[in-house]
């Protein structure tokens, strides 16, 4: 059994760790609130872009952009968004499981896959377990610009435009609330019907005006579809950042609480040992006094 000195040293060590985890919990809570605000600010832009694109697409049924054209699937690409740092519970592990399950379904149909990664945890995952990574970006911080994230996204879109990829998926953690993060795999291109459907986009076709487009619908669609996809990717990254901070806050709270439980248990053992030592000393004193008398 450990001595009183060893137990005191353990308690001191755990208290130091508890201070660190409590501080990390508070920092994560603050960062989560800021990430939530940025995420909420970005949503109206993404939804507005979706409505504009939907209106343009439905106004010009003659032109089909490559991003709206389905083709037979021989090779798929995944844009994977992970965190740069750990200590976030099972956030990244659950996302990897979701991704691998989705990839396995395609592999069972002899469809190949390649990956573009945002976040160092995703890069580390593929280094350990294999997988063709065509592009990656790390250290993107808590408030990245799209320019920081553009390289892997553009690499995937170029491969799709060149016919090397037949479908692209976006993989990230959706922020539900402070306690819940949901791993998501969603089709990016070709755009799913729900992305360009008037009803799903919130457009009332009965009250919709007929616009004059300059220079022409094709040019507008070509430009806006790229911006729309950029907005989807950026919003996914914002969701993942908020998810990361909320998961870290929860994990650090659990670590802080567990440290408190360990301290209480060790304190109980310490008190019992100390009580036993005092009792033994008293017994020795009483025994010695009795022997003298």
From Swiss-Prot:
Q: What is this protein called?
A: ATP synthase gamma chain
Gene from which this protein is expressed = atpG
Membrane-related topology note:
Peripheral membrane protein
Q: What are the GO MF terms of this UniProt record?
A: ATP binding; proton-transporting ATP synthase activity, rotational mechanism
Q: What does this protein do?
A: Produces ATP from ADP in the presence of a proton gradient across the membrane. The gamma chain is believed to be important in regulating ATPase activity and the flow of protons through the CF(0) complex.
Which organism was this protein described from?
A: Psychrobacter sp. (strain PRwf-1)
How does this protein assemble?
F-type ATPases have 2 components, CF(1) - the catalytic core - and CF(0) - the membrane proton channel. CF(1) has five subunits: alpha(3), beta(3), gamma(1), delta(1), epsilon(1). CF(0) has three main subunits: a, b and c.
Q: Which Pfam families match?
A: ATP-synt
State the compartments where it is located.
Cell inner membrane
GO BP terms, alphabetized: proton motive force-driven plasma membrane ATP synthesis
Q: Output the InterPro entries linked to this UniProt entry.
A: ATP_synth_F1_ATPase_gsu, ATP_synth_F1_gsu, ATP_synth_F1_gsu_CS
Q: Which keywords does UniProt give here?
A: ATP synthesis, Cell inner membrane, Cell membrane, CF(1), Hydrogen ion transport, Ion transport, Membrane, Transport
Q: Check the record and name the PROSITE patterns matching this protein.
A: ATPASE_GAMMA
